[in-house]
């Protein structure tokens, strides 16, 4: 450092005497500074072993040379403009490195994005340094933006630049010997709030498993246990959407328990406590019903059918076959609950001869066939249930006109031919909509007969 200080003062005096600043710098200062960095580059916070480095090159090749030496990568890519290409031979000479030049326009940010993506795909598993020291503002900004984005998918990427501790305003240069390569921390690791935005985005899209993973990772990186509560919330909705009611209930109960602790009374999720308690109560009701398989537990039937109809609505655009299955099953549960009010079960309805004959006639009317062509199954299907309940005076179903019922008959009878059941058919959106509409009407009737009130599986807002 003493030698460089002395050189710097002699350089200053030579410039004051009227010498050319650039030529004098190259003659007096640069060889000593370059020799120092070739031997031991100054890197903050500490030297790291990069396998690949990518540099933007403008009209300051000295800074780029220091960045190449500081990164120490075996493979060096240089993004240059047509104007800065003239510095490539000098960079090779100063660094002793083989360079892989890539020409781009000085304002072509999209080209930088494409090149960084290409290079990271080519070197996916190794540490990569992205150096934005030199080049135009557009080039540096583009490389920084690319680095921030791709660090989400390539965590070994680091953004670096050559900084200095002392700038000489008279000579309008960083004071030689004060330069250092600064390696910026990955913001996705250093700043949990960045990942909180990603987690929030995933949560809003219904990607609850991925959101939970982000929240758990943030706990590990920051030590802030508040994110663990968000992870529990996302995990509850993930399990709920997967129809794993036991796991959803477990996560929901644990979440409410933690929100009750003094340390979390001011947690943003406590502002949604009433809605959360109602959702956990719904999960408890469904869990009891699934374990007991007793249609007298109407709150559980309601919760399960409500969930299935919600999933049908979510899936109708992207997965019509799944939407149909959800809607079919929701309607079946609601019809079975109404049948249970009569003391009957679909799998063993115990029809009297008179009831069987009346049901044949009702089905024949709906299907437009002769009664003798109707075969009654041992277990009542969807259309059989609907027709039988109407015969027994079910008020909600009795309000449906014969035309409406005939419109539904084909869709109800076609359940077993659906692609994910026993057949090859994909139910039409119109058929699914009709089934869901009928189920929704029965759900509202059941809702009025439960103590739960209107509830929604919709995720509560995160509060940030």
Swiss-Prot record:
Quaternary context: Homodimer. The protein forms a twisted, head-to-head dimer; the composite ssRNase active site is formed at the dimer interface.
Region (HEPN domain): 191-464
Regulation of protein activity: Non-specific ssRNase activity is allosterically activated about 1000-fold by cyclic tetraadenylate (cA4), which probably binds to its CARF domain.
Region (CARF domain): 1-190
Pfam families in alphabetical order: Cas_Cas02710, Csm6_6H
Any GO BP: defense response to virus
Protein's UniProt name: CRISPR system endoribonuclease Csm6
Listed EC numbers: 3.1.-.-
Co-factor: note: Does not require a metal cofactor.
Substitution effect: residue 422 to A: No ssRNase activity
Origin organism lineage: Bacteria, Thermotogati, Deinococcota, Deinococci, Thermales
Origin species: Thermus thermophilus (strain ATCC 27634 / DSM 579 / HB8)
